[in-house]
Amino acid sequence: PPAETFMMILAIKIVSETNAVGSTGVDITGMETAYAAVNADYGGDMITAAAENRYGRTYRYTAGLTEPADITGGYLLARSDTAKAKQDAANGFVTARGCAMNVQSPAWCGRDAMAYISEYYQAFEDAVYAQDAAGNYTGYNAETGKYYYEYCDLTSLVQVYLLQRLAADACAVGVSLSFYKDAGGLLYAGPVSDMELACGDIGADDDFDGGRYLVSALLQIPGFRAAVGNYCHDTFLVQAQRLVGDGGRVMT
């Protein structure tokens, strides 16, 4: 999405529809429709159960569902409350670093599909946090042979980071973290939402980047830092400056 779209939320508390899959929301493959096509009672009297993926991480799925032909998308994920390493939607998973992700769509997700998306996301997280023997962050998952940007679109990661960094939102990434993935495609960061504390509730002297999930590791990857700098210089900075008034305050 263009930078202008992200900028619109900087100066206001957003009142809008909840993130959802659809032509006016996240326009990706509707897996709920695909599930309903092969499960006559989809959405009624669903029962969930727990299992472990190949990384040994727990996920919750909907029992008894017939899977659609393509389980690679679309998914809409949102981070759960960081105070508890447990998803609070019907289906979701917990990563190796204690990040609980809700699967917002499809609302009811079969076992194979949940294994797929939880393992895909874990491979991405492992790539972000990967280090070489000297402790340098590489962004490379040696087990899968892929870089983090081969799992998640790099530009979307940069956009979400810059927006939340500029907004100085305490919820950024900690709670306000969403991803979506279409069938056969990469994961994308966003849409940005749940910024009810924005803007500026983190003071100038506070450390926004240090210790924050994903961000603290991404910023130690040289390629990500370069991508942030390039996008900020070429696109983001001009849009941000339009919002800044006298004294450096974001205009309302």
Segments (PLM) and residue ranges:
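Phosphate/dinucleotide-binding and metal-coordinating scaffold of catalytic cores
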Residues: P1-T252
